Regions:
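Feature of Fe-S/electron-transfer and energy-metabolism proteins
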Residues: 1-209
Length: 209
């Protein structure tokens, strides 16, 4: 629960009324729902103080649960599309690829293939036109890492695709998402429409050529 960063566990529909009445209205922590440290046996109210999470830093999922995924203004307020602006106005495509190389960015699949190499190969490949393909299908059983990003932060995916398209010389992009993820598809459609309305997607992005 934000902004206090209180972390409740095993919450069910039956617990919602108590959280609203006691925590949100009464400003009291619902202690019975707090995480209990398995070693000390003590209740830990804050997410950032749980041993398993305290040394972790969210990167891809940093906005998950913190912004409204269907509101582009929430994404902008969290720094969204600033990287796109920097890339388009301050960097060449080659510089973008080199930045990705220095960052050590890799694919999220099991192979962990270096992203810079993939982008460089695409940029240097002969033939035109080129297309940016976002494969949001999850072939591993029980894997939902792509689905979570699409449902919780679709604008981050779109921004990344635009930057990739700029770097590799692609002017069109496609997202492959299975029909079993209707919420992800819905939110992607909303995000795409919003990005187009704000001049962040389509022809002449941010008034560029």
């Amino acid at each position: 629960v934000q902004p206090e960063d209180i972390f409740y566990c095993h919450v069910s529909v039956d617990d919602v009324d108590e959280i609203v009445q006691k925590h949100l209205k009464g400003h009291q922590v619902v202690t019975r729902l707090l995480y209990t440290d398995p070693v000390s046996g003590q209740a830990v109210p804050y997410y950032s103080e749980i041993n398993f999470y305290k040394k972790q830093e969210r990167i891809i999922l940093r906005n998950c649960g913190r912004i409204n995924p269907e509101n582009i203004d929430d994404y902008l307020a969290s720094g969204g599309y600033l990287s796109l602006r920097k890339v388009l106005f301050q960097m060449t495509p080659v510089q973008v690829i080199e930045e990705i190389r220095r960052a050590g960015l890799r694919g999220r699949g099991g192979a962990g293939f270096p992203t810079a190499i993939k982008w460089e190969l695409c940029r240097n490949a002969s033939g035109s036109p080129k297309y940016m393909i976002c494969n949001a299908d999850e072939g591993d059983p029980g894997a939902f890492m792509d689905r979570v990003v699409l449902e919780s932060d679709p604008h981050q995916v779109i921004e990344g695709m635009i930057i990739c398209g700029y770097a590799i010389g692609a002017r069109e992009g496609y997202i492959y998402c299975r029909a079993e993820y209707p919420l992800a598809i819905k939110r992607l459609k909303v995000a795409i429409a919003q990005a187009e309305e704000y001049g962040l997607l389509g022809d002449n992005i941010l008034n560029t050529d």
